[in-house]
């Protein structure tokens, strides 16, 4: 059964875990080690080329992931683009989580407070262009 490697800055929700187990047949979820998670969550905005910055994350995937494992990739647009292409090149399956946004306005003391909730809908593959 495939594993799911997690390149994003949150914890999986119960809905995401259940969906991955049921529909993708994932049996194990692999979070990045703490130091790599810090890298992924803090992509520097002032660096022209992030290839060297992402190298430790790529090395982690090369060491631990096998073809047809899933990689949930969400975050900085440039880093996501590079890691999606890396995953495809390594015969991994890059995916992202789709959500339904529910917004509710609350009127209190002459002010409008907007509460947004995000509900997981499904995982979707990044397909090569």
Swiss-Prot record:
InterPro entries according to UniProt: MJ1673-like_dom
UniProt cross-references to NCBIfam families, sorted A to Z: CAS_Csx20
Protein name according to UniProt: Uncharacterized protein MJ1673
Highest classification ranks of the organism: Archaea, Methanobacteriati, Methanobacteriota, Methanomada group, Methanococci
């Amino acid at each position: 059964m495939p594993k799911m490697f997690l390149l994003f800055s949150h914890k999986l929700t119960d809905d995401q875990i259940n969906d991955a187990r049921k529909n993708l047949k994932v049996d194990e979820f692999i979070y990045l080690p703490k130091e790599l998670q810090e890298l992924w969550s803090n992509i520097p905005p002032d660096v022209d080329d992030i290839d060297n910055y992402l190298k430790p994350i790529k090395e982690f995937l090369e060491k631990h992931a096998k073809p047809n494992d899933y990689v949930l990739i969400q975050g900085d647009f440039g880093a996501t683009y590079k890691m999606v292409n890396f995953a495809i090149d390594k015969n991994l399956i890059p995916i992202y989580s789709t959500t339904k946004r529910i917004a509710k306005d609350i009127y209190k003391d002459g002010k409008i407070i907007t509460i947004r909730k995000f509900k997981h809908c499904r995982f979707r593959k990044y397909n090569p262009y």
